[in-house]
Curated annotation (Swiss-Prot):
Keyword terms, alphabetized: Cell inner membrane, Cell membrane, Glycosyltransferase, Membrane, Transferase
HAMAP family the record matches: WecF_RffT
InterPro entries: WecF (IPR009993)
Top EC class for this record: transferase
One Pfam family linked to the record: Glyco_transf_56
Protein name: TDP-N-acetylfucosamine:lipid II N-acetylfucosaminyltransferase
Annotated Gene Ontology cellular component terms: plasma membrane
The reaction(s) this protein catalyses: beta-D-ManNAcA-(1->4)-alpha-D-GlcNAc-di-trans,octa-cis-undecaprenyl diphosphate + dTDP-4-acetamido-4,6-dideoxy-alpha-D-galactose = alpha-D-FucNAc4-(1->4)-beta-D-ManNAcA-(1->4)-D-GlcNAc-undecaprenyl diphosphate + dTDP + H(+)
Function: Catalyzes the synthesis of Und-PP-GlcNAc-ManNAcA-Fuc4NAc (Lipid III), the third lipid-linked intermediate involved in ECA synthesis.
Pathway it works in: Bacterial outer membrane biogenesis; enterobacterial common antigen biosynthesis
């Protein structure tokens, strides 16, 4: 059997590193179909930190796409597993037959599914991408994204799968003995990316709570974002006193980020699509409820796991937040499907489907 090749077709360092390390640590030892990778970006020590993987790095999307297409044409039995698919050339290859449907398996990350960019080139490309998506062999995604995708592509096979968020299962009970009282701290957004709509989110938080809460805005990622960070800071200072606004411009290491999250009482995410599952998982693990946009279909995954969900359209106050905290504390977090190690079973099944071992 031809070994499955995994494709990380865009230079998204944080996510790519997470996927590679997950495969190296959790999957590669037991499956030959979890070892071959083609990645856009620099090595930056990844090969050394993932010794069980065979990783080929490419300088850009185009060079990787050309290599994938060449492999696909040379051997029609070769199958590819695309982790997030932001590479236009690969969509066009699927649409034109350069890559066959039986060769194309796609794990939806979120931004690669929704059509939120307003630029002309995106508006011209989106219809072509929709046509190509009809030809995917199988999609893997959250429950909410599967539902969203099925509305326009009902004939494409869909399977439940969660991004392998870095988590320590031993921390699942860490919040149970914590007492929450006094001024609330609210986390706004999961990164410095503009898709978080930070300014709109800050205004929404202020409308709900006024200047009675402390707001923390993590913006250390992506890099070279100083102008936008300052824009958010100034907008925040028009709404909140300086002591109640903390805009973080430095990237935090994982343990420091966990410590930050544990100091919060609520996560507030205004974006209208699925994103930031990693931060949501870590907040839920810490017993911290989250406010979502009703257009973000991840609420379906949360309710399926019997987790409380608050919405940006709800009338929120401290009593409602504290009640959501109490409800969350009563949930057995060891049973949540999108937590580690529970998502591992989904990955094992995904590999079996993509290789044809499971019909």
């Amino acid at each position: 059997m031809t070994v499955l090749i995994h494709v990380l077709g865009s230079d998204i360092p944080h996510h790519n590193r997470t996927v590679l390390r997950f495969f190296n640590d959790a999957l590669a030892a037991t499956s030959e179909h979890a070892r071959e990778f083609m990645v856009v970006g620099k090595d930056d020590g990844l090969s050394d930190s993932c010794p069980t993987l065979s990783v080929q790095f490419f300088p850009g999307k185009k060079s990787l796409a050309e290599a994938v297409i060449a492999k696909a044409k040379a051997n029609r039995q070769q199958r590819f597993f695309f982790h997030g698919q932001f590479n236009p050339t690969l969509w066009l290859a699927l649409l034109s037959g350069g890559i066959k449907p039986s060769q194309f398996y796609w794990h939806i990350w979120g931004a690669d599914l929704y059509e939120l960019s307003s630029g002309l080139r995106y508006k011209l490309f989106y219809p072509l991408r929709r046509l190509a998506q009809k030809r995917v062999g199988c999609v893997f995604a959250t429950r909410g994204d599967l539902s969203f995708f099925a509305k326009t592509h009902p004939k494409v096979r869909g399977e439940l799968l969660y991004f392998p968020t870095r988590m320590d299962p031993s921390l699942n009970t860490m919040a149970n003995d914590r007492q929450r009282e006094g001024k609330m701290t609210i986390l706004v957004g999961n990164s410095g990316d503009r898709s978080n709509e930070h300014i709109a989110a800050l205004r929404a938080v202020h409308q709900q709570f006024g200047d009675t809460v402390k707001v923390v805005v993590p913006m250390g990622y992506p890099p070279n974002n100083e102008a936008y960070i300052e824009e958010v800071r100034q907008a925040g200072l028009e709404l909140f006193s300086e002591e109640n606004l903390q805009v973080l411009s430095e990237k935090l290491e994982f343990d420091a980020y966990l410590t930050l999250l544990r100091q919060c009482d609520l996560g507030y995410f205004i974006f209208a699509r699925q994103q930031g599952i990693g931060t949501l998982c870590l907040l839920i693990q810490a017993g911290i409820p989250c406010v979502l946009n009703r257009e973000n279909p991840f609420w379906q995954d949360m309710t399926e796991q019997h987790l409380p969900v608050l919405f940006t359209t709800d009338d929120l106050n401290e009593d409602i937040v504290r009640e959501a905290q109490r409800q969350l504390a009563s949930v057995d977090k060891n049973t949540i499907a999108f937590f580690s190690p529970n998502y591992l079973q989904g990955w094992q099944r995904a590999l079996a489907i993509a290789t044809g071992e499971v019909a």
